[in-house]
């Protein structure tokens, strides 16, 4: 397989980024396709999907001409600037490695791989092939969380933060028939959000991981200290009453309590009433979920990075740190 010549990394801002997408499942078509379709800086030129019905449905819905059963053939023919690989995590590594070796910038869903070592190797491949990489840790980019953190930091650095992810999965089996654990596959959203809120590097971890009425780990709780001086609390539990993702962000005299989907509030100076409400739809100016919950913003960030040659915030090297914190949570049980 011949490696095509790379385009220059630094691009003219007005030129649209040509994107090819591998995968046309539910997550891809509800978040990534609409985000890219709505982005004036990007153009989806092709889709590759083994399921022809899904491929044609997605291509018809978003007006995509290129349709392929082979992602390698798609890249060779379409010569995209960037490729999105949106598929189950245990199918990812070889596809990601091949895409980058073919000279394309790469954006993937979380988790970026099955293990922290695989993620580190992907970061090395990205560096060696001089391509940009990004992972869909969209909670960082959700307006409630991103703007909430910024508002708190006007008073000083974040000293404490909490990230929770609860689901009602009572009686449910493990993810992908046991191919991957819940913390790495899904609750990693809260792990990455905690890293983002606290800043700095992980210094110490104390955790409690449980199999609650199940044969797989479904409860992950942790206390994490960071070199920034902040302390973070992680609470993820798949045996609760309902699905909910929440954060607490605390700087001196000011706090955010919020949910990136349901909204939040900013409190300060011991006042009972919030000084500002955080409505995700009002903050982004849209009622569309892919805009209000962070998907559009994380996609837009990646596209802008491709245009400018800047490494995305959630690149594989940074994602390796999130995956390593997942490892530490398992290794640091009290």
Each model region followed by its residue ranges:
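N-terminal Rossmann-like dinucleotide-binding module
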Residues: 2-62
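Hydrophobic residues in well-ordered beta-strands that form the structural core
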Residues: 68, 108, 133-135, 162, ...
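Mid-domain beta-loop-alpha active-site segment that forms a flexible
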Residues: 136-144, 169-202, 318-319
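C-terminal glycine/acidic-rich active-site capping loop/insertion
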Residues: 138, 248-317, 321
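Beta-loop-alpha module in the N-terminal Rossmann-like domain of NAD(P)-dependent dehydrogenases
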Residues: 51, 65-123
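C-terminal helix-rich "cap/oligomerization" subdomain common to oxidoreductases
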Residues: 2-16, 82-85, 227, 301-334
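A contiguous active-site-proximal alpha/beta segment in oxidoreductase catalytic domains
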Residues: 113-172
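Contiguous beta-strand/loop segments that form the cofactor/metal-binding neighborhood of enzyme cores
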Residues: 185, 191-263, 296-310
């Amino acid at each position: 397989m011949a490696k095509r010549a790379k385009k220059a990394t630094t691009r003219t801002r007005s030129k649209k980024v040509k994107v090819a997408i591998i995968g046309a499942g539910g997550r891809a078509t509800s978040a990534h396709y609409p985000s890219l379709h709505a982005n004036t800086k990007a153009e989806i030129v092709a889709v590759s999907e083994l399921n022809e019905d899904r491929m044609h449905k997605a291509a018809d819905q978003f007006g995509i001409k290129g349709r392929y059963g082979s992602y390698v053939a798609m890249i060779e023919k379409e010569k995209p600037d960037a490729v999105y690989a949106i598929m189950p995590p245990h199918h990812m590594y070889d596809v990601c490695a091949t895409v980058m070796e073919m000279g394309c910038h790469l954006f993937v869903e979380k988790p970026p791989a099955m293990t922290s070592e695989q993620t580190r190797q992907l970061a090395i491949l990205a560096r060696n092939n001089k391509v940009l990489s990004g992972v869909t840790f969209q909670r960082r980019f959700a307006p409630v969380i991103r703007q909430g953190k910024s508002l708190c930091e006007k008073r000083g650095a974040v000293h404490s933060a909490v990230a929770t992810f609860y689901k009602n999965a009572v009686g449910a089996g493990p993810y992908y028939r046991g191919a991957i654990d819940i913390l790495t596959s899904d609750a990693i959203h809260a792990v990455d959000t905690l890293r983002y809120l606290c800043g700095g590097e992980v210094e110490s971890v104390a955790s409690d991981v449980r199999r609650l009425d199940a044969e797989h780990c479904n409860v992950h709780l942790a206390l994490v200290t960071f070199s920034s001086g902040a302390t973070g609390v992680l609470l993820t539990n798949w045996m609760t009453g309902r699905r909910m993702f929440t954060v607490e962000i605390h700087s001196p005299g000011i706090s955010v309590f919020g949910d990136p989907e349901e909204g939040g509030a900013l409190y300060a100076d011991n006042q009972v009433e919030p000084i500002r409400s955080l409505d995700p739809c009002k903050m982004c100016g849209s009622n569309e979920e892919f805009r209000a919950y962070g998907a559009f913003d994380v996609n837009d960030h990646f596209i802008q990075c491709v245009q400018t040659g800047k490494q995305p915030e959630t690149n594989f090297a940074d994602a390796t740190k999130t995956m390593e914190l997942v490892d530490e949570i398992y290794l640091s049980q009290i």
